[in-house]
Structure formats: C-alpha cells, structure tokens
Amino acid sequence: MSDRAMPRILLAEDDDSLRGFLARALERAGYEVTACADGDEAAAVLDQDWDLLLTDIVMPGLDGIEVARQAAARHPGLRIMFITGFAAVALAAGESAPAGSKVLSKPIHLREIVHEVDRMIAA
C-alpha cells in the first residue's frame, strides 16, 4: 500500500447503479475511489498510483481481465479483485486472471465487498 492516508481504489463497473453503490460504500469505509464506467475508461487512468483494482469482468470496451493484466504489468503487486455475474464463464473461456487476484460472484452484499477489500488492502 502507498504512504497516503486513504488507500486508492480504481473501480471499473458498467452497471451505473452498482458502480454508485460500490463507490459510496467504499468511500464511507475510508477509501478514495475513482469510478469508471467501462474498461477503456479504467485503462486510461492506470498510470496513476492505485492500491487496489476492483473490476467487473464483462464490460464494454476492454474487459476486466484485460484491464487487470494491464494494471498488473504497470503495477506489480497491485491487489486485484473481480466482481462479476459471469465469473465461471469469463474465466473458463481461456482467460486467466493475474496471480493473486480474487473473484467475487454477483449478487453480493456491499458489506461483503467492503470486508474483502479491507482484507486485501491489509494483506
């Protein structure tokens, strides 16, 4: 984790409502969140300093796995978490997530996501 007081999370989620709920829940938990509507938007800010990438897998433009690969290449050791309703399908289709990443399946409670983010940031 960086030396900043608030860990920074890059959130990529194409569902507007879910993206808003996640961003607010994580901000209330003490995180600085940059929320992106798709993989292309997230890829455009990958050069910034992030503590965790929280991304959907199936999105318009770049999918979450490709965003995660690019993020991991630029930031070795970056914590990566996928939230998706298509985890089994997306990851079984020959796609491989970066080592050490975590996959959470939708539907999922916001509390559970915040708890998992807390655990990954603390690790």
Report residues per predicted region.
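Receiver (REC) domain active-site loop signature in two-component systems and cognate sites
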Residues: 59-60
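Conserved acidic carboxylate
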Residues: 13
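Active-site residues of response regulator receiver
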Residues: 56
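Charged docking surfaces used in two-component/phosphorelay signaling
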Residues: 17-28
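Acidic catalytic/metal-coordinating carboxylates
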Residues: 38, 63-67
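Non-catalytic signal-transmission and effector/linker regions of two-component phosphorelay proteins
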Residues: 1-10, 77, 111-123
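Acidic, metal-coordinating helix/loop segments flanking the phosphotransfer/catalytic sites
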Residues: 35-52
